[in-house]
Amino acid sequence: MRPRGQLATVLAGLAAGVGLSGCAGHGSVAAAGYRANVAQTAERISLAIASARMGVQLDLDGKMALAVTDQTVSHAAASADSAASALAGREPAGEAETTLRRQATAPIQDAVAALRALRDAVGRGDRGGIGRALSGLDGPAREVDELRRVATGR
């Protein structure tokens, strides 16, 4: 297998792992369960951001074709959106979890929006837009990492 083919296989595997790590079902969950759902959502979104960044950086370095980058980034954006939607379908069990939900909403929405912007720029083949969108992931990535720390208490 050529290096690009191997890289595409690795990225596809990473993206598939991100997609398979999702939360199933909806409804109210106990306090610890809700915190775990928030932490898992933040982790999935962090992995999606890392996957998208890696794909774009490899493309910018000339090590991956734009079409493969487009697939990688599109899958990352879809995975983050799916994780956000799954969490939105969960009802917090109590006041502390409701507060956590309020804390989680903006970082999750910002990260999903940033990944969508990157996906759109890659889809257009807009190199300047790709660079701006890639930089635009920095803040949301930090916010989601902080959310994960808050949700896990670490």
Predicted region positions:
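Bacterial N-terminal signal peptides that target proteins for export
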Residues: 1-11
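Flanking scaffold residues of small Cys/His-coordinated metal-binding clusters
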Residues: 15
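C-terminal motif of bacterial Sec signal peptides marking the signal peptidase cleavage site
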Residues: 18-22
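Bacterial signal peptide processing site
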Residues: 23-27
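Alpha-helical segments in soluble extracytoplasmic regions
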Residues: 33-116, 129-153
